[in-house]
């Protein structure tokens, strides 16, 4: 368990308001048998320093910090145990855009310095592109497509992925792109549709004349293209290059980090 830690989405709800930072970060160390208070406090202070916070913050409470600082405390809590894998559950979605870039760049620096592996969960595809090496796109709890980040963003081969990428805002006002607006309501994950889970909202199926195979046969992930690119679509080859080119546009993520932590 020590080798796997998590950074929670909500920096306001994931920290116990009744506990000082020293105990919030040190709780995991205590659970793993680090009973010496001096050793534990030293590890806590080191963890705070690593994420860009002052060592003397250990006696403060969560309400004394900003959202960005609270998320740094959450990151320090995860790092204190020396994990190999860190699950990042939407770690910047609750933060202001100006703070998001700081936290993302911090996570990238920590990955490099401590040789970490991240499982990064996000709905922001611009952030995913900036942050990830490989990407898996899920729909109703199942993988729809996965692959190298550059390959998948350049040549998506699942209709759902194409629709998601079409929704990324384009910062260039001179460039026009077509957005694929999905029809219908999202089905319940507890009672997903038969066959392909996306068939009730799939623009490609409608374009192909609503083939019955999408309803009766669940598609399995299969190789398509290079770099371990796989997709779960019976008609992935029909996702034409013209459609992909007209909808795929990526948005640059703020990469400048302010010197002082938020």
Protein language model regions, located:
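A short, proline-enriched helix->beta-strand linker immediately N-terminal to the Walker B motif
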Residues: 80-84
């Amino acid at each position: 368990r020590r080798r796997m830690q998590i950074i929670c989405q909500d920096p306001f709800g994931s920290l116990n308001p009744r506990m000082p930072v020293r105990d919030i970060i040190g709780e995991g160390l205590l659970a793993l048998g680090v009973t010496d208070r001096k050793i534990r406090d030293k590890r806590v202070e080191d963890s705070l320093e690593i994420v860009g916070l002052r060592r003397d913050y250990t006696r403060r409470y969560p309400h004394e910090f900003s959202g960005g600082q609270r998320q740094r405390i959450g990151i320090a809590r995860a790092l204190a145990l020396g994990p190999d894998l860190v699950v990042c559950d939407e770690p910047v979605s609750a933060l202001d855009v100006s703070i998001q870039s700081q936290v993302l760049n911090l996570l990238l620096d920590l990955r490099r310095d401590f040789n970490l592996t991240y499982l990064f969960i996000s709905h922001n595809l611009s952030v995913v592109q900036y942050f990830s090496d490989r990407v898996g796109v899920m729909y109703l709890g199942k993988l729809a497509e996965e692959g190298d980040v550059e390959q998948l963003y350049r040549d998506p081969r699942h209709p759902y992925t194409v629709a998601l990428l079409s929704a990324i805002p384009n910062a260039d006002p001179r460039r026009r792109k077509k957005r694929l607006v999905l029809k219908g309501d999202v089905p319940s994950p507890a009672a997903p549709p038969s066959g392909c889970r996306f068939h009730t909202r799939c623009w490609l199926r409608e374009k192909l004349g609503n083939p019955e195979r999408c309803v009766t046969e669940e598609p399995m992930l299969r190789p398509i293209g290079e770099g371990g690119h796989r997709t779960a679509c019976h008609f992935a080859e029909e996702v034409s290059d013209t459609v992909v080119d007209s909808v795929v546009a990526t948005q640059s993520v703020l990469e400048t980090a302010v010197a002082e932590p938020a």
